[in-house]
């Protein structure tokens, strides 16, 4: 499954969360109507990410955090072996960020899936990652968060002229 940094779409579109998700999960075109089984699949997916109350809301009316949780629900249907999160909380407020990562952490623990998180937020990485790959063009260092954060390579990447911190 894949959750992008952001989804580009016409925010004035009347497409609801149900329509959006059903378009990906339905065996028939959504314009023919959303079937009962598809609605059940959508509701179950939304429940996994604690956003079942959003199904009737227009996609463009969602906050950044709500939209990312809907995208997470879609990425989890069907359940993947690997979930890729590409800067998934870019532009999301602090409450949305915490809620998103708590949901991801819960899913990781209960479903035993591998999660690849691309992030520049070192606090999030330190808090939620089991393993870290530090890159600057190529792999510079890898290991558990503390080992990587305490390394000379980390200091060189983030605290020297070539780094961005």
Feature map (PLM): residue ranges:
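Conserved ABC ATPase signature
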Residues: 58-62, 66
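A short, surface-exposed alpha-helical micro-motif characterized by mixed small hydrophobic
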Residues: 125-127
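H-loop/switch region of ABC-family ATPase nucleotide-binding domains
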Residues: 119-120
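Catalytic Walker B motif of ABC-type/P-loop ATPase nucleotide-binding domains
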Residues: 83-87
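Conserved ABC ATPase "signature" region
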Residues: 36-54
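Conserved beta-strand-loop-alpha-helix hinge in the C-terminal portion
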Residues: 138-161
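Conserved catalytic motifs of ABC-family nucleotide-binding domains
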Residues: 79
């Amino acid at each position: 499954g894949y959750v992008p940094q952001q989804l580009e779409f016409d925010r004035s579109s009347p497409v609801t969360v149900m329509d959006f998700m059903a378009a990906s999960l339905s065996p028939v075109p959504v314009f023919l109507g959303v079937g009962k089984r598809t609605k059940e699949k959508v509701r179950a997916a939304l429940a996994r990410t604690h956003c079942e109350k959003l199904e009737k809301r227009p996609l463009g009316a969602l906050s950044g955090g709500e939209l990312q949780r809907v995208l997470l629900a879609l990425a989890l249907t069907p359940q993947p072996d690997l979930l890729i999160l590409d800067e998934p909380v870019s532009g999301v407020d602090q409450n949305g960020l915490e809620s998103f990562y708590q949901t991801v952490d819960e899913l990781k623990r209960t479903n035993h899936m591998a999660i690849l998180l691309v992030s520049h937020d070192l606090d999030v990485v330190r808090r939620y990652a089991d393993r870290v790959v530090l890159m600057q063009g190529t792999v510079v260092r890898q290991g558990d968060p503390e080992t990587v954060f305490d390394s000379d390579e980390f200091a060189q990447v983030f605290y020297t002229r070539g780094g961005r911190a």
